[in-house]
């Protein structure tokens, strides 16, 4: 609901910079179900690198954890900003913004996709912009789901431990795959 309130629609970009927390999934699944591209930014990047990613990706909305307030204060990119889990000067409160919104799904749900960035070992971080799913159904299968169920025998009873930062491709994609199958994900901070 928040994404639509800010005019974000199919193929628009939202960016997150968060520590590992269950809210990470609330935001990524919300973006995924809204047909958005969601950029998960490393909390280890400099303000210059983060600004570059926000500008390069075309992010229209940025959500940062209040625990990263030091990094948040140094950003210069002009984008609508929210902080999660506490006050950050210059950022709206995500919790306050969500409170009046309906808890029901949006009417125009469709599948979105992550847009992750490399660590920039040969220069600036590079965004990997994969095509949005052709089938807009939010419950469609994908190659990771088929691999997880076929090779690794994941089921709705599976419990998956993810010890790595969720801004990395493998932890994010595998844990969301477990969710898609109906399993449980345990994340480490």
For every predicted segment, state its role:
Residues 45-74, 95-96, 100-101, 138-161:
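Conserved ATP-dependent adenylate/AMP-binding module captured primarily in the ANL superfamily
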Residues 70-116, 124, 130-145:
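ANL superfamily adenylate-forming
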Residues 14, 31, 62, 118-121, ...:
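Conserved S/T- and glycine-rich ATP-binding loop of Class I adenylate-forming
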Residues 35, 121, 182:
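Conserved G/P- and acidic residue-centered "switch" motifs that form tight phosphate/ATP-binding loops
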Residues 18, 41-42, 65, 79-88:
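Short beta-strand elements of ligand-binding domains
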Residues 28-34, 56, 168, 176-180:
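Short hydrophobic alpha-helices that are characteristic scaffold elements of the AMP-binding
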Residues 2-48:
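Conserved AMP-binding/adenylate-forming
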Residues 136-159, 163, 167-189:
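Conserved AMP-binding/adenylation subdomain of ANL enzymes
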């Amino acid at each position: 609901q928040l994404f639509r309130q800010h005019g974000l629609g199919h193929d628009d970009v939202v960016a997150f910079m968060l520590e590992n927390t269950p809210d990470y999934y609330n935001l990524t699944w919300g973006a995924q179900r809204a047909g958005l591209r969601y950029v998960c930014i490393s909390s280890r990047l400099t303000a210059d690198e983060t600004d570059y990613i926000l500008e390069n990706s075309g992010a229209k909305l940025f959500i940062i954890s209040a625990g990263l307030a030091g990094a948040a204060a140094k950003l210069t990119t002009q984008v609508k900003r929210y902080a999660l889990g506490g006050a950050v000067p210059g950022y709206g409160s995500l919790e306050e913004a969500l409170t009046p919104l309906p808890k029901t799904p949006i009417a125009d749900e469709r599948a979105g996709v992550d847009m992750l960035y490399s660590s920039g070992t040969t220069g600036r971080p590079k965004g990997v912009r994969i095509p949005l799913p052709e089938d807009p159904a939010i419950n469609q299968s994908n190659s990771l789901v088929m691999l997880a169920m076929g090779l690794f025998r994941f089921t709705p009873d599976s419990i998956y431990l993810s010890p790595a930062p969720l801004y990395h491709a493998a932890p994010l994609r595998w844990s969301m795959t477990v969710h898609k199958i109906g399993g449980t994900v345990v994340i480490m901070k």
